[in-house]
Structure formats: structure tokens, C-alpha cells
């Protein structure tokens, strides 16, 4: 699993002109699921995201986690995070998990993130064309990969 976590002051997902989900202060998570991903990847990322200290402590230091600032999560599935661009100019998404594998892991990720963090978890709609809006705070953007444990 690969994620892009962005610290936001607000974020929203709009589908077919209607706002589906929105949050205030928190993290927008773009989540890419690959064929080799398992429940272990879900657990590792959810634990890491919950404890990730990327929020300002008032002294210009990132010392606070999402619980300490009362933030929320907005999770959006994004298979393009597993694009391969080595050959040619058209990205290949061969490593991205097929929907029959990805959807259960996506739903598990949403559930476990809420359980582990105790925070509100909003989401986009798996497979839908979405307009994602955000105000990136900082900007702070973190890329994590569960296979590399970084």
C-alpha cells in the first residue's frame, strides 16, 4: 500500500456535482492498493497514520498527532499511486490491485483507521470520478509505503 498524507485545514470530495464528504482540520489520505497488499499492510499504515506527529504544537514544531488536535481523516482511493513509468510515456497500472481485491482492503482500511484512531473517517467512493479539493496546511505532504515500511 502506498499513501500520500496531506495535512489540511479542510478537504472535500465531490461526485457528480454533489459534495459526498468533507472535513475540517485533519489529513487527506490518497490510498493506492497493490496486488501484494494484505491486512498486515492495512494495520501498519493505520497505526502509523494515527501516531504521525505532523501538526503544529504552537511553537512552530510538528509535535502533535491527529488525536491531539481533534482532527479528522478523508480517505480517497487512488490506484494511480502505483503507476509504472519506466517504459514509454503511458503509465502502466499493472501493479495496482483489481477491484475485487482492492475494495475489501479499502473498506478494511477505513474501518481500522476509525477504530485505531478513534477519529472521524470520511471517504470518497471507490472507482468513482471525483473532484478532490483541499487546503494543504504548511504545506505538509508525506508519502508512505507499507512494503518498504517507510
Residue spans for each PLM region:
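Glycine/charge-rich, flexible interdomain linkers and switch-proximal surface loops
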Residues: 58-73, 122-134
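Short beta-strand segments
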Residues: 6, 32, 77, 133, ...
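Compact, glycine-rich, soluble single-domain proteins
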Residues: 18-70, 80-111, 116
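Positively charged, low-complexity, intrinsically disordered RNA-binding extensions
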Residues: 93-150
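RNA/tRNA-interacting regions in translation and RNA-turnover enzymes
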Residues: 11
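Residue-level signal for inorganic ion chemistry
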Residues: 45, 76, 140
Amino acid at each position: 500500500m502506498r499513501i500520500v498524507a496531506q495535512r489540511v485545514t479542510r478537504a472535500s470530495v465531490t461526485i457528480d456535482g454533489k459534495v459526498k464528504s468533507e472535513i475540517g482540520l485533519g489529513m487527506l489520505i490518497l490510498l493506492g492498493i497493490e496486488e501484494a497488499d494484505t491486512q498486515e499492510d492495512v494495520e501498519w499504515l493505520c497505526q502509523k497514520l494515527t501516531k504521525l506527529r505532523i501538526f503544529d504544537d504552537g511553537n512552530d514544531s510538528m509535535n502533535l498527532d491527529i488525536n491531539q488536535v481533534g482532527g479528522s481523516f478523508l480517505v480517497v482511493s487512488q490506484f494511480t499511486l502505483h503507476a509504472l513509468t519506466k517504459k514509454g510515456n503511458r503509465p502502466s497500472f499493472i501493479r495496482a490491485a483489481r477491484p475485487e481485491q482492492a475494495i475489501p482492503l479499502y473498506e478494511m482500511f477505513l474501518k481500522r483507521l476509525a477504530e485505531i484512531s478513534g477519529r472521524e473517517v470520511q471517504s470518497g467512493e471507490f472507482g468513482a470520478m471525483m473532484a478532490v479539493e483541499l487546503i494543504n496546511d504548511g504545506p505538509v505532504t508525506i508519502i508512505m509505503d507499507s512494503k518498504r515500511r517507510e
